[in-house]
C-alpha cells in the first residue's frame, strides 16, 4: 500500500506491506530521527503530520525500514523519537 507522506519532499511516499508488517520509509523517518525538510518542497510541519497520521497509525509492531541506518518499529519511534514528540 502506498502512503503519501509529504514533508521531506512534496512527493514523499512510504510503502506498507501489511502481510509482512513492514514499511519502507525512505527519508520520512529514521531510527531516532526524521528526514531533512530544507529542500525546495520540504516542510517540517507536513513531515510531522505525515508521520503522525500515516506512520504512527500503523500497528505498533510494524517494522520500519528507513533509507539510512538501522531498522526500527512504529512502537519504538512513538516512544523514543525526539523529533516526533
Where do the protein language model's features map onto the residues?
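Metallo-beta-lactamase
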Residues: 4, 9-85
